[in-house]
Regions:
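H/E-rich (His + Asp/Glu) clusters that bind or coordinate divalent metals
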Residues: 236, 240-384
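Active-site gating/metal-coordination segments in enzymes
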Residues: 28-33, 106-231
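Acidic (Asp/Glu)-rich catalytic clusters
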Residues: 53-55, 80-87, 112-125, 149-158, ...
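Acidic-and-aromatic substrate-binding clefts and catalytic sites of carbohydrate-active enzymes
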Residues: 68-76, 98-111, 135-144, 172, ...
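Bacterial Sec-dependent N-terminal signal peptides
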Residues: 1-25
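An N-terminally biased module of ancient metal coordination in phosphate/nucleic-acid-related enzymes
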Residues: 25-118, 146
Length: 384
């Protein structure tokens, strides 16, 4: 074969390969001409397995992690209670007691009005946690004032606990520098919670991938693409993820007489062996499962072992209030279903598997553990 023919055949082969690749990229899929994106790819599973969707919990439950901002409105709370009844939610804990304002008068009114409205019109269906205003930490006497307000909220107005937002460590600044979670000026507040016998639910940091490069290896790539404000940069002054977690743990260690509920399982739901070891180190630490059910639902065997071992320290929480999303939580905790969808793709592009917890453990997670550590809740609506 002449050199010219060889060259021609080689060229034709290259053209054929390129053509095949281009055709593969331009296959018409549905109404989409061209390559589909990761966001668009939503294959319908062909797997045929038993399905047991759950619209309500098997037992009445306490949602320890919820946020409501109009609980002073009787009509809106009445609608909320009807939704709670459909889910079998016996009691909701509103962690946003003081709302989002740093105006002291408005903050006080928000807390007092919603506690009074729910106590008067919907008794025993809600508990409200108070909050701390960190925006004035640089003012003289801030610590003493914050401790006094906390005590007043609990003793005289009926607040059942303290919620600390992730802004502490991520956003709260003094002289243009972030205030650490373990700032010593906050120590008297943690100690006061122990004296008052109320729990502190604390959200520190965010998922570790928020500190990692936004590339094809980042498991939270889609979330960071759609919520760019969640990306953290130590080069721009942010604490590292490891620093924030250590700051939080310093607080737990220093205040062993105070009960802490580590929100979102302390961002270790994807490393249950590590979380298990931390629960040995910090006997005053409980965890709740808000916004991390997707992590548990992809490791059903490991999750079940963890729940069996730590059944006395885990609480049910949801975080964002979207009634239709509770079904995923019920199904992961109660069923043994396989390969069912999660409700929010940017949180989890993988499928869920049920853990199949026993009734004994379900009762503890759903309500018994919360009744144990949140003071003054009505136990009559919950089975023994």
């Amino acid at each position: 074969m002449s050199q010219m023919k060889k060259l021609l055949l080689h060229s034709l082969l290259i053209i054929s390969i390129i053509s095949q690749k281009l055709n593969a990229q331009n296959v018409k899929i549905g109404d989409n001409n061209g390559t589909i994106t990761f966001e668009e790819y939503e294959p319908k599973s062909t797997l045929v397995v038993p399905q047991h969707p759950l619209k309500k919990a098997k037992f009445p439950f306490i949602d320890i992690h919820n946020h409501q901002f109009e609980m002073d409105n009787q009509e809106k709370v009445a609608r909320l209670v009807k939704e709670m009844d459909k889910l079998n939610m016996g009691l909701m804990v509103n962690l946003s007691g003081r709302g989002w304002t740093d105006n002291e008068a408005k903050s006080n009114a928000t807390l007092y009005d919603q506690i009074e409205n729910t106590r008067k019109n919907f008794p025993n269906r809600f508990a409200v946690f108070t909050n701390v205003d960190f925006s004035k930490m640089d003012e003289a006497g801030w610590t003493e004032k914050a401790v006094a307000k906390l005590a007043d909220d609990v003793k005289n107005h009926g607040a059942k606990g303290l919620k600390i937002y992730k802004s502490l460590g991520l956003n709260v600044k003094e002289n243009n520098k972030l205030v650490p979670v373990d700032d010593p000026r906050i120590d008297p507040i943690w100690a006061k919670c122990g004296e008052l016998g109320i729990p502190v639910i604390i959200h520190t940091a965010d998922p570790a991938p928020f500190w990692q490069p936004v590339d094809s290896y980042n498991e939270r790539w889609l979330e960071l693409k759609t919520h760019r404000e969640r990306k953290r940069e130590t080069s721009k002054g942010d604490f590292s993820w490891e620093q924030l977690i250590e700051q939080q743990h310093n607080v737990f260690r220093k205040h062993s007489k105070t009960t802490f509920i580590n929100a979102h399982m302390g961002w270790y739901p994807n490393n249950l062996s590590k979380l298990d070891s931390l629960m040995d180190v910090f006997p005053n630490m409980y965890v709740e499962i808000g916004a991390v059910i997707a992590e548990l639902g992809r490791q059903p065997r490991a999750a079940k072992k963890f729940f069996e071992k730590r059944q006395d320290k885990i609480l049910f929480g949801k975080d964002s209030y979207v009634p239709d999303e509770y079904e995923t939580y019920f199904r992961v905790l109660e069923s043994e279903d396989e390969y069912f969808p999660y409700h929010k793709k940017y949180h989890a592009f993988w499928r869920m598997y049920g853990i199949g917890l026993s009734d004994t453990i379900l009762k503890k997670v759903y309500y018994k553990n919360a009744l144990k550590i949140v003071p003054g809740l009505d136990k009559s609506k919950f089975p023994e």
